[in-house]
Structures are given as C-alpha cells and as structure tokens.
Design a protein with these regions (language model features):
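N-terminal signal peptide c-region/cleavage motif recognized by signal peptidases
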Residues: 16-18
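Bacterial N-terminal signal peptides that target proteins for export
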Residues: 1-7
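C-terminal cap/substrate-recognition subdomain and adjoining C-terminal extension
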Residues: 21-32, 36-42, 46, 61, ...
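Hydrophobic helical h-region of N-terminal Sec-dependent signal peptides
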Residues: 8-13
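Asp-based phosphoryl-transfer active-site loop
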Residues: 59-77, 267
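A metal-dependent, Asp-based hydrolase signature
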Residues: 78, 83-162, 166
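Short, solvent-exposed loop/turn and secondary-structure capping segments
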Residues: 75-78, 83-86, 195-196, 269
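Short loop/turn motifs at secondary-structure junctions and domain boundaries
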Residues: 54-58
Length: 327
C-alpha cells in the first residue's frame, strides 16, 4: 500500500472515529446516538430525580414498564416463544404418532409454517397448549433453558437470548441506577420470560408480568407442586396490560415503553398524568434488524404511531438513526 493510500485511510479512519465519538457518548447510554430520543431519556430522568424541581418524582413512584417482544429483544420473523413451541412439537412428535396426520402438528413436523399460521390463533393455541402445559413449572422452565442453550436464530446465527437490544439494556440500567423500579409487561409467556429475562435485564422474576396459562396446586405424598394447565389465565395484551399493571403493581407507571399497538393502552395509562413519558421502539433498520410497522402481522405499529406523532410526551425511537448498535 503506497503512502497516498495510507494517508487517505488514516484520514478516513480519523473521521470515522471522530464521527462515532460525536454521535455516541461512551460514558452515558453509549449505544445511543446524540438524538432526540437519547435527550428525551436523559431529560426525563434528570427532571424526575431533581428534588428542587416541580417535576420531581419520589422514589416510591418511579415505576417504569417495558414490553418485551420487539421492545427489549427482536420479534421477527416470528415471536421467539413461538419458535420454542414449534421446536417442542418436533421434539415431542415421537411420543405422538397421531400428529403425523393431525393439524396443525402435521404442518409443524413438515416445516410448513405458512400452513401452520394459516390456521390462525386456534392453531397456535393448540400448539401452545401441548408444549406449555401438563407439566410442573420447574419442568417447563427446564425445557426452556435447554432450548435456549441449543437453538439459534437462522438469520443472525445467535442464541435467541443474545438478540436483546443493547441500547434498551443500557436504558434499563440507567433507570435502575436512578432508582426507577423496572417491570416487564409483555404479551409473552410469564414463565418463559422468567427463565432468562432476569439475567438479561436485571429485572427480578416478581417484576415480570406476562400471559399465562392457569395453574393447579396439589399436595401428594408430602410433596407440593404447581402444574401448568392447558387453559388460558390471562392474555397480557392491549387493555389487559393496564388491568394487570393495576392488579399486580398497584400503581400507575410514570414511564411506559413499547413498540406496537398492543402497548398503546399502557402508554396512554402512564401518560395520563403530569411528569410522565411514553416511548416507542420503531423498527426502521432492515440492515441490522428488521423494518416494519403498519402492515406487519407481528408487532403491528399503526394507531400508536399516529398517537405518538400527535403527543408531546410520546417519543419515537428510530432504530436506524438513534442507535449506534442494535445487539
């Protein structure tokens, strides 16, 4: 390489690093560019924690709720818990020879996902029931652990629990360091998330709220156990998120973060008071992750997108332009 090329490379490298330094502060939310989203987060936290300001929020009221799928980790091309369920059907197929001719299991075994999803919610519910019930909570969570240790996302070649968003992990840490109590309020299965989310997000099991099948307690031969049944207890989506927040947390959050219309209700609930904020992760980066919103079957963002554009205390996070890194 001649001197001219070396000089050119040095200049370009210098410009690249200087641009990175300008855009990404290594000391505060380092995976966030210096954009409106980062400013909104920092301003909200600083105003909430400064006791000399009217915007001060007592520690006991610093409640922040986060969706999980599409907000804290990816959700494409299918929800990761669905990927787990499909793999479990294949693993259990040896014990169920009747599935070879019985839908939707036949299509799962044959990897015909188009036909599986053509069956709609009823097909998915059948799949979820046979893979998520008829066992103790401990047995179920062990199966999730084993799956996470072996399964890989086909596009990125990573373990599914390595596909959490680095900027969002930093945001959670920043809030936690400023005495915000962070909760997950997700449509995902609560027992599924409690296996891996505490380590990923530093959020304890008791602060994870999600969908659940009914449980049954029994005490036989001196042994207590809790079984997972094949009947829905709660589907933690849309307005049910607000109802579960009230039932379980008992306080209105001051910050709600989501990515889809399924999160709109809890964002409305959180921002129906002064000194509050909602944030929406907008998937705009098809190169590093996925690009989707209004027309997506998974994580559709339509009505909430319109509301975000009309509300002063709702902030859109533009994944492509606001994040220095995704994973």
């Amino acid at each position: 390489m001649n001197k001219i090329h070396l000089c050119t490379l040095a200049v370009l490298t210098s410009l690249s690093f200087s641009s990175l330094a300008k855009d990404c502060d290594a000391n505060l939310l380092p995976s966030w560019k210096d954009s409106g989203s980062k400013t909104a987060i920092v301003n909200f936290v600083e105003q909430s924690t400064d006791s000399s300001k009217a915007t001060f929020i007592p520690v006991s009221d610093r409640i922040a709720v986060f969706d999980n799928d599409g907000t804290l980790w990816s959700e494409k091309p299918i929800y990761f818990q669905i990927a787990f369920a499909l793999d479990q059907v294949k693993a259990l197929a040896k014990m169920h020879p009747e599935w070879k001719t019985q839908e939707p299991f036949k299509s799962v075994i044959e990897n015909d996902l188009e036909k599986v999803f053509a069956g709609g919610k009823e097909s998915l519910l059948q799949i979820m029931k046979v893979t998520h019930s008829g066992m103790t909570v401990e047995e179920y969570q062990q199966s999730v652990e084993q799956w996470l240790a072996a399964a890989k996302d086909k596009r990125f070649g990573k373990a599914y629990n390595d596909l959490t968003f680095k900027p969002m992990r930093e945001m959670l840490t920043y809030l936690q360091e400023n005495n915000f109590k962070t909760y997950i309020v997700s449509g995902g299965g609560v027992d599924f998330m409690r296996v891996w989310a505490p380590e990923a997000y530093n959020i304890p099991e008791e602060q994870i709220i999600g969908s659940a099948l009914k449980y049954e307690y029994s005490f036989n031969d001196g042994q207590p156990k809790v079984m997972k049944l094949g009947e829905l207890l709660t589907l933690d989506d849309k307005e049910v998120k607000v109802e579960n927040i009230q039932y379980i947390i008992g306080k209105k959050p001051v910050l709600a973060v989501g990515n889809s219309d399924g999160d709109q209700a809890m964002m409305q609930w959180a921002t129906s008071q002064p000194n509050s904020m909602a944030m929406i992760v907008h998937h705009t980066d098809e190169a590093r992750e996925w690009k989707y919103d209004r027309q997506s079957d998974v994580g559709r963002l339509d009505k909430a997108l319109d509301e975000a554009n009309a509300r002063d205390n709702w902030q859109l996070i533009d994944m492509k332009n606001d994040w220095c890194a995704v994973y």
